[in-house]
């Protein structure tokens, strides 16, 4: 394939398929293999950075962030045995233990929930 006359060279097309960004072809971006690999690495680094931010927040107690008595939302792995047993019945709703026991946390649309990693539960519970 030639690069002239609106055609795309193999060097241009292969990394574009790898990155799955067909819009870049329409914009006329000259996407090379090193550029594509760099873009993938930046995306991976950003994802890992966000994961670490969330993980560090999960280790904070309510008092450390000035939310005494409000409660803390924990992933299902931290929930009590009773909450785990009831998890199947609750579905995507959250349960509250402590001063707000018996009430339900507001439910969130499915699109707002992060997709669980392989082997991870979607159920989440609130604890104080």
UniProtKB/Swiss-Prot annotation:
A GO cellular-component term linked to this record: cytoplasm
Keywords, ordered alphabetically: Cytoplasm, Nucleus
Broad class of the protein's primary localization: cytoplasm
Localisation: Cytoplasm; Nucleus
Region ranges (Disordered): 77-128
Superkingdom to which the source organism belongs: Eukaryota
UniProt keyword Cytoplasm present: yes
Subunit field text: Interacts with PRDX6.
Protein name: Saitohin
């Amino acid at each position: 394939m030639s690069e002239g006359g609106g055609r795309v060279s193999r060097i241009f097309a292969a990394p574009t398929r790898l990155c799955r960004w067909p819009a870049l072809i329409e914009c006329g971006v000259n996407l090379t293999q090193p550029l594509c690999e760099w873009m993938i690495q930046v995306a991976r680094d950003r994802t890992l950075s966000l994961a670490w931010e969330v993980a560090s927040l999960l280790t904070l107690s309510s008092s450390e962030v000035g939310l005494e008595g409000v409660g803390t939302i924990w992933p299902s792995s931290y929930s009590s045995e009773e909450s785990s047993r009831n998890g199947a019945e609750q579905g995507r709703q959250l349960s509250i233990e402590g001063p707000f026991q018996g009430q339900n946390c507001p439910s969130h649309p499915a699109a707002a929930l992060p997709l669980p990693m392989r082997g991870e539960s979607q159920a989440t519970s609130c604890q104080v």
